[in-house]
């Protein structure tokens, strides 16, 4: 009798357990599906977050944009010329609108300069430098968005 009960219990349990061969195939299929899903998710994540641009965060000539006595005539905002009496707004606007300049001496070739303006340029010539124009700063030469 005990043997009969034991046989019934084993057959009942066996009905709910898959054979080893079927279980491995199902597991292999699930692993393959997981791998496909994860690879698709990785591709989607790569497309959702494209490579970032290599922007220059620390511009080596940032001091010439108004933080020192020397002013970069190609990249500085017109308000920087407030430090030099007589240049702002008229001559500063001419300097900003006629660049870029290869050298400080090119400032004297600005069309329409008066004799007085050339004298002012000569007075402050030692405080000017002509660095390579940087698009991030050239665009802000007239309006850098800073208001008092």
Curated annotation (Swiss-Prot):
Disulfide bonds: none annotated. Residues 1-32, 33-54 form a transit peptide. GO terms for cellular component: chloroplast thylakoid membrane; extrinsic component of membrane; photosystem II. Signal peptide: none annotated. GO terms for biological process: photosynthesis; photosystem II stabilization. It holds the Pfam family PsbU. InterPro entries: PSII_PsbU (IPR010527). Keywords: Chloroplast, Electron transport, Membrane, Photosynthesis, Photosystem II, Plastid, Thylakoid, Transit peptide, Transport. It is a peripheral membrane protein. One of the extrinsic, lumenal subunits of photosystem II (PSII), which stabilize and protect the oxygen-evolving complex. PSII is a light-driven water plastoquinone oxidoreductase, using light energy to abstract electrons from H(2)O, generating a proton gradient subsequently used for ATP formation. Stabilizes the structure of photosystem II oxygen-evolving complex (OEC), the ion environment of oxygen evolution and protects the OEC against heat-induced inactivation. Belongs to the PsbU family. NCBIfam families: PRK02515.1. PSII is composed of 1 copy each of membrane proteins PsbA, PsbB, PsbC, PsbD, PsbE, PsbF, PsbH, PsbI, PsbJ, PsbK, PsbL, PsbM, PsbT, PsbX, PsbY, PsbZ, Psb30/Ycf12, at least 3 peripheral proteins of the oxygen-evolving complex and a large number of cofactors. It forms dimeric complexes. The oxygen-evolving complex may be composed of PsbO, PsbQ', PsbV and PsbU. This is Photosystem II extrinsic protein U, chloroplastic. It comes from Phaeodactylum tricornutum (Diatom). The lineage of its organism: Eukaryota, Sar, Stramenopiles, Ochrophyta, Bacillariophyta. The gene is psbU.
């Amino acid at each position: 009798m005990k043997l009969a009960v034991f046989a019934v219990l084993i057959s009942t349990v066996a009905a709910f357990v898959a054979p080893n061969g079927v279980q491995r195939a199902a597991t292999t299929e699930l692993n393959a599906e997981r791998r496909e899903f994860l690879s698709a998710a990785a591709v989607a994540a790569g497309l959702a977050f494209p490579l970032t641009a290599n922007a220059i965060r620390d511009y080596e000539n940032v001091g010439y944009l108004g933080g020192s006595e020397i002013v970069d005539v190609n990249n500085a905002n017109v308000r920087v010329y407030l430090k030099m009496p007589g240049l702002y707004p008229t001559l500063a606007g001419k300097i900003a609108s006629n660049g870029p300049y290869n050298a400080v001496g090119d400032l004297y070739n600005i069309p329409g300069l008066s004799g007085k303006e050339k004298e002012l340029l000569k007075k402050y010539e030692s405080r000017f430098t002509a660095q390579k124009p940087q698009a991030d700063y050239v665009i802000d030469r007239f309006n850098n968005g800073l208001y008092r």
